[in-house]
Design a protein with these regions (language model features):
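Bacterial Sec-dependent N-terminal signal peptides
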Residues: 1-27
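Extracellular/luminal recognition modules and glycoprotein regions
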Residues: 23-59
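A structural boundary/capping signal
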Residues: 26-30, 61, 102-103, 219, ...
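N-terminal post-signal-peptidase region of extra-cytosolic proteins
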Residues: 47-65, 77-79, 97-108, 113-119, ...
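Acidic helix-start/capping segments at beta-turn-to-alpha-helix junctions
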Residues: 92-100, 196-199
């Protein structure tokens, strides 16, 4: 078990296998030079493309939006055409392992999965844990609210089911997530990722209030409007981050 945890630590701190960074040619064509990406497209793309077409989504004009809910251990995939106003739900994928507790990541080595609004910073088609997408942590808010000097980093959505701060999926469904994000990146769009402690239902909100301290509940109250806005409008909320590290929503 100790050996497994040590390997997971290397994965979540980016010490195993550098991320892919070539820029020549189209992004997708460069990704397809890697065996795991090529295999993913060969075995799963036709089915995924059919799912997209059933939603009237064109892969050549697609944008992708990802939501992750820690308590529910779910990753949601939403898609839309660039010309569409609203996203449509595509599928839900189980997050197959977890670490830490509900609440944001505030320092290096706390084993926490971040919470907040991010993008995909980079793609790793040769990860030690199959395929990996680097979450854009720390963002401006995280850097301001850090507990100490070191935020930590290299938080990944990846294959396999071992983690101490990343978001692990099984190898088969991570192919779908990876391919969708490759397609979106190839369309010159950056998939947005929103990570929440849970879905902010009345029951869950009561659970958070009764079981966690004021600091966490104040943070959750700050990010909840993004969840609520998307639930109502099926488009992500516009936001900025102020000098105190708080999200400020402008919709």
């Amino acid at each position: 078990m100790k050996a497994i945890i040590n390997i997971a630590l290397l994965v979540c701190t980016g010490l195993l296998n550098p991320v892919f960074s070539q820029e020549t040619g189209t992004f997708k064509s460069q990704q397809l030079k890697n065996k795991r990406v090529k295999d993913a497209y060969a075995t799963k793309w036709s089915g995924l493309e059919a799912e997209l077409k059933a939603k009237k989504i064109s892969p050549n004009a697609m944008e992708v939006f990802v939501r992750i809910f820690k308590k529910e251990k779910e990753l949601e995939l939403w898609v839309k055409n660039k010309s569409d106003a609203k996203y449509v739900f595509l599928k839900k994928i189980a997050v197959c392992a977890s670490s830490g507790e509900l609440g944001p990541k505030r320092k290096e080595g706390d084993y926490q999965v971040p919470e907040g609004i991010y993008d995909i910073a980079s793609f790793n088609p040769n990860s030690s844990y199959y395929l990996a997408l680097k979450v854009g942590y720390p963002n401006k808010s995280d850097k301001i609210l850090v507990d100490g000097k070191r935020t930590g980093g290299d938080i990944m959505i990846h294959g396999n089911c071992v983690t101490i701060g990343c978001v692990p999926l099984q190898d088969d469904p991570v192919k779908d997530v990876y391919m969708l994000c490759v397609e979106a990146k190839n369309n010159n769009t950056s998939p947005r990722i929103e990570i929440y402690p849970c879905k902010f239902t009345a029951e869950n909100s009561k659970y958070l209030e009764e079981n966690f301290d004021d600091g966490k509940n104040n943070f959750w109250a700050n990010i909840k409007p993004a969840f609520t806005y998307f639930e109502a409008n099926k488009t992500p909320a516009k936001f900025s981050i102020n000098t105190k590290g708080a999200y400020v929503f402008s919709n």
